[in-house]
Amino acid sequence: MFPGQGRHTYGGQQSNYSNQQQGYDQGYNQGYGQAYGQEYNQGYDRPSGPPPGQGQYNRPSGPPPGPPPGQGQYNRPSGPPPSQQGQYNRPSGPPPGQYGNNQTRGSGNEQNYGNMHGSGHYSRPPTDSQSFGVENYNYQYSNCSGRKKALLIGINYIGTKNELRGPINDVNNVEQFLLANGYSSDNIVKLTDDQRVQRAIPTRQNILDAIQWLVKDARPNDALFFHYSGHGGQTEDQPDEYGNYDEDDGYDEVIYPLDFETNGFIIDDLLHTMMVKTLPQGCRLTALFDSCHSGSVLDLPYMYSTKGVLKEPNVMKEAGAGLLQSAMAYATGDRSRMLSGLGGVVKTFMNQGKAEKANEYSKQTNTAPCDAISLSGCKDDQTSADSKENGTATGAMSYAFLTVMSQNPNQSYLSLLQNMREILSAKYSQKPQLSASHPIDTNLQFIF
């Protein structure tokens, strides 16, 4: 992939989700015992073979929204990822400079975003238990005073025609930022496809095992940080055993491990089960996703707008566009296009009820007592750019997050979202998203 192009959805069949879940259970119970880093250099063999064959997770009948105009669609690689460890070469140059609290990115040629929000004083999250709703559902903010652990995943897909240039740099840059903000190298695990240690390559199994390490023995007020930079996509949402759907747009979001062709993608339902449902009340998870279609990739049901209010599914904009199309067709005498536009409007109104039901079901099933926050690079129907900033390849979302937090670490949830949007709006159409496992006060201080 070349700078400025989206990290697009791959085509082709994907693995059966029930088989993926089974594979997760097997990997999860292998047990890591000691810190992941202590086993890091012992080598970790790849799974003996791929999971059972293809199944119910086929490609959607209609493709998810494509890339912005002028950007190419990326096909799946023609062959499996390189199997020889020698082919995983390190980048030719070092990542950009250190990210301290008051430092800016790069070599001094970067733009200074002097009009950033976030200069005010923000209250830290309350330490007592919170509740909401008629059933008084309990949750708790984390004060992030406990252990700090981080899992950073960057996949360039080296040697394939789907190759990206920024993810490995993103991981190195986020690591530098975390080290400057209270995290220890002993509690940071990196999976990148330039590694020579087999266990550190971002295969599907290695990613799932590393997630297990991240959440293992989590306690209230711990601070966990998860960063993924790579390809993302969508697949058709499947109902649960009761026939209920939890995606208001009809699609689940996925991320693509290095070995996705043989072992499949990782679906948002599984990410939520492993990283959100397993955490105790008051444990913090900050997840940063720099990938396409990543708006709800962690299935957190409370998504916030740049006004600090909850977003609800709204397909009425599509209906308005359809009516405009029909009116223009009527004016030009194009009867067939007019009827087509009106048909789309009817379908949109029918979908609104389905979307609202899925959104409500997601809140019922995916609300969690832990303190999970997701910062994602774009909406579910958007692509996320692999770009170049100050002469260095980077993911646009990773760059925006690090730029905001490095120039002014005093941010609220809302100001962080607004500032990231402002940085990206100058060059990209993608819109960063903020979502949470429980309702949040977006004017509280963002801590991690």
UniProtKB/Swiss-Prot annotation:
Top EC class, one word: hydrolase
Positions with biased composition (Pro residues): 61-70
Organism: Candida albicans (strain SC5314 / ATCC MYA-2876) (Yeast)
UniProt xrefs under Gene3D superfamilies: 3.40.50.12660
Listed name of the protein: Metacaspase-1
GO MF annotation, one: cysteine-type endopeptidase activity
Function: Involved in cell death (apoptosis).
Catalytic residues of the enzyme: 231, 292
